[in-house]
């Protein structure tokens, strides 16, 4: 288990961070990320799995899993909800007998959890999210991945209405997604495929160091017991209960295309994405669908996410945005060509790209964004 309590106390005294990760290592030869997710889903409906593979099908160094979040942040049409799960402690018998007025929480017994909810109306959820991120900001630790806990979830396409309110975007259709759903995971299970280790990670909060360190050590032991002896959930496969149909019929969609072409001709826009979601009633779980994706379409960004009311599974080749060491990067595929095998082929691909109006429009759109 590392770092030591003395090292954590030293880092806490510096005052740079309010949360410091602590880690316990296990050998990974008895586990797989898929098997681990079966255990975590049995313990909590709120969980995730993040994995990565490059184009040559070489798997990334880490697979990340999390469960049982301490907070969930959701927002729909400006109504922001923050649900917190706080741990409960009880005085030990000796403290009661001596008549102490206050409980020393470092010596208190952990007896359970309680939930609370805060609801507010906001013009932009980003302000509340930034405050929470700042409260739980953690240092990068030796022998740990850069992600050691934090927010995991999704922002829907409708989230744009908070950044561009003047567009007055309204949706007549009832959407399946909230504007955002983010969960705060203090515990992380990371598979280090390079070192063949499973890293169990939780956080020590510096505002009550003794109590928090003791509880973190207990939590790591609870995680160890869970993954070694926990029950596994059987995920029922997806079974369609109705035909898959587009949200817009062909005639309506063609009408939308013609209207978009008119706006482009008038100069109001130069590109538009006209989505047409496919819908069907189904039973079962998306987790087996995720397993098929990771086997048939290994990608740099593969994800499975589950909450009380939704499951999401996907595999994406693109880096939308990446923040590392204070540097923000984006690597979209639109408006690009693959590299050639020779300098001559590179030149030919470059010339073809520069003459492709569609690719140029996509490139300009991304630069504009």
Please report, for each region that a protein language model flagged, where it lies by residue.
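Extended alpha-helical targeting/anchoring segments
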Residues: 1-100, 104-106, 111-369
């Amino acid at each position: 288990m590392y770092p030591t309590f003395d090292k954590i106390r030293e880092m806490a005294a510096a005052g740079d961070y309010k949360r410091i990760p602590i880690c316990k290592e296990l050998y990974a030869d008895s586990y797989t990320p898929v098997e681990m997710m079966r255990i975590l889903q049995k313990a909590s409906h709120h969980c995730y799995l993040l994995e990565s593979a490059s184009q040559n099908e070489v798997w990334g160094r880490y697979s990340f899993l999390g469960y049982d979040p301490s907070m969930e942040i959701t927002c729909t049409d400006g109504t922001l909800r923050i649900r917190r799960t706080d741990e409960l402690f009880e005085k030990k018998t000796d403290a009661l007998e001596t008549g102490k007025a206050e409980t020393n929480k470092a010596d208190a017994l952990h007896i359970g959890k309680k939930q609370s909810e805060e609801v507010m109306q906001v013009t932009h959820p980003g302000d509340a999210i930034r405050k929470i991120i700042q409260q739980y900001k953690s240092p990068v630790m030796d022998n740990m991945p850069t992600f050691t806990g934090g927010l995991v979830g999704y922002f829907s396409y409708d989230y744009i209405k908070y950044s561009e309110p003047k567009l007055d975007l309204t949706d007549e259709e009832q959407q399946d997604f909230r504007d955002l759903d983010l969960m705060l995971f203090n515990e992380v299970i990371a598979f280090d495929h390079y070192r063949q280790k499973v890293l169990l990670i939780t956080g020590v909060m510096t505002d009550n160091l003794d109590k928090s360190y003791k509880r973190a050590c207990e939590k790591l032991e609870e995680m160890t017991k869970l993954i070694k002896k926990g029950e596994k959930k059987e995920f029922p496969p997806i079974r369609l209960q109705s035909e898959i149909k587009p949200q817009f019929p062909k005639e309506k969609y063609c009408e939308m295309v013609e209207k978009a072409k008119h706006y482009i001709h008038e100069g109001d826009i130069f590109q538009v994405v006209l989505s047409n979601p496919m819908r069907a009633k189904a039973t079962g779980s998306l987790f087996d669908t995720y397993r098929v994706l990771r086997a048939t379409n290994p990608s740099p960004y593969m994800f499975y996410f589950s909450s009380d009311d939704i499951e999401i599974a996907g595999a994406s080749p693109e880096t939308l945005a990446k923040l590392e060491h204070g540097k923000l990067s984006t690597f979209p595929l639109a408006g690009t060509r693959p590299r050639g095998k020779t300098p001559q082929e590179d030149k030919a691909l470059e010339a073809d790209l520069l003459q492709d109006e569609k690719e140029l429009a996509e490139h300009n759109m991304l630069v504009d964004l």
